[in-house]
UniProtKB/Swiss-Prot annotation:
GO molecular function (one): rRNA binding
Keywords attached to this entry: Ribonucleoprotein, Ribosomal protein, RNA-binding, rRNA-binding
Functional description taken from the UniProt entry: Protein S19 forms a complex with S13 that binds strongly to the 16S ribosomal RNA.
PANTHER family (UniProt xref): RIBOSOMAL PROTEIN S19P FAMILY MEMBER (PTHR11880), SMALL RIBOSOMAL SUBUNIT PROTEIN US19M (PTHR11880:SF8)
GO BP: any one term: ribosomal small subunit assembly
Organism: Borrelia turicatae (strain 91E135)
Cellular component GO terms held in the UniProt record: cytoplasm; small ribosomal subunit
Protein's name in the database: Small ribosomal subunit protein uS19
Recorded superkingdom: Bacteria
Length: 92
């Protein structure tokens, strides 16, 4: 179920304050956050936000295409190593 429009998008308060503070600067700074549930808003466009995946911070460069998505979508928490190889393939 989607979030109600009247509530607006969720974004952590401290992250929002950092985004507003860095949008006025000339030099771009990487913003670190643990908030994977925060929604990407238009004020974040052209910023680099490092999202924690449980082990390390993954840098995400925000473009207009990413607006409306969650930050956690772009920092995977699991590593897919592939399915087990079948030994029965060559036997007969």
């Amino acid at each position: 179920m989607a979030r109600s429009i009247k509530k607006g998008p969720f974004i952590e308060k401290s992250l929002y304050q950092k985004v507003l503070a860095s949008s006025g600067r000339e030099k771009r700074v990487v913003i670190k956050t643990y908030s994977r549930a925060s929604t990407i808003i238009p004020e974040m466009v052209s910023l680099t936000i490092s999202v924690y995946n449980g082990k390390s911070f993954i840098p995400v460069y925000i473009t207009e295409d990413l607006v409306g998505h969650k930050l956690g979508e772009f920092s995977p928490t699991r590593i897919f190593r592939g399915h087990a190889k079948s030994d029965k393939k060559g036997r007969k």
